[in-house]
Amino acid sequence: MRHLISMRDIGREEILNILNESEKMEAILNENGHCDFLNGRILATLFYEPSTRTRLSFETAMKRLGGNVIGFTDISNTSVTKGESLADTIKVISGYSDLIAIRHPSEGAARLSSENSKVPVINAGDGSNQHPTQTLLDLYTIKREVGHIENLKIAFIGDLKYGRTVHSLCQALSLFKSVEIKLIAPDELKMPREVIEDIDGKLKLSEMTDVEIDDVDVVYMTRIQKERFVDVNEYYKVKGIYRLSKEHIGNKNVVIMHPLPRVDEIDSEVDNIPQARYFKQSFYGVPVRMAILKLLFEDSIK
């Protein structure tokens, strides 16, 4: 694995390898809190869009591996404001670092970065396209909290049009056997047809607008993303259309996930019930990103 840009680029065995490595990293965190696998190495974090969990978990992961971090979170302090192209920025920064993690508002920016980099590039989110490290931590959460990925029933609820985490996760789940997916969204925010066509026939798929979750293993809630709407009036038409409360949760074994940040789609009272795993899901971002950084670096020096 030279870069991690899209879930389409990696197969089932590579996914399982990353998940197995993540278990080792979690054990290290629980035992010692750190190791020296990437001692003296540098990760560049280039965040052209706001981020809390993804950026900080990448930085934490690199430091837990013994490495260091450089980067930016505010493009107004960079040469982007002078008109420097993304390709040129990557060519320069790949000379300063051993790995790059980039978040960018434009679809395809991570792919372009990988084509201009001397070092491995990790897509930390490119517009509404892909978010592969989130997908891998989601799969890890499912494996750890449900106990299995195959023979899985999962309901995705909310913004399935702009939600890059959902696009990536559906594509990854299509590689596993006997997966059933419910896509629950208003007409304005349905899953893009190209994603449906990509996964159709590989798993059991149903689309609906009403919330039906009593028979699923996982409920995956998503935020309605105001920043993705060209017309803000369209956002207000669907804002708050789905709100998960304790009354909706009749299945004591269901696992409730959310990529975060949350706005109003999950009542805060849900946080205190055992089915809520979204904060644990967020924690899993550290061992999973540790595994990704370690494996990518090892592959880059072979």
From Swiss-Prot:
Coiled coil regions in record: none
One GO process term, biological-process aspect: 'de novo' pyrimidine nucleobase biosynthetic process
First-level EC class: transferase
Gene: pyrB
Keyword Signal listed: no
Taxonomy of the source species: Archaea, Methanobacteriati, Methanobacteriota, Methanomada group, Methanococci
Name the record gives this protein: Aspartate carbamoyltransferase catalytic subunit
GO cellular component: cytosol
Protein role: Catalyzes the condensation of carbamoyl phosphate and aspartate to form carbamoyl aspartate and inorganic phosphate, the committed step in the de novo pyrimidine nucleotide biosynthesis pathway.
Catalytic activity, reaction form: carbamoyl phosphate + L-aspartate = N-carbamoyl-L-aspartate + phosphate + H(+)
Pathway where it operates: Pyrimidine metabolism; UMP biosynthesis via de novo pathway; (S)-dihydroorotate from bicarbonate: step 2/3
SUBUNIT field: Heterooligomer of catalytic and regulatory chains.
Keyword flag Glycosyltransferase: no
GO molecular function, one term: aspartate carbamoyltransferase activity
Family: Belongs to the aspartate/ornithine carbamoyltransferase superfamily. ATCase family.
Keywords of the record: Pyrimidine biosynthesis, Transferase
Annotated residues for binding of carbamoyl phosphate: R53, T54, R103, H131, Q134, L260, P261
Binding-site list for L-aspartate: K82, R164, R223
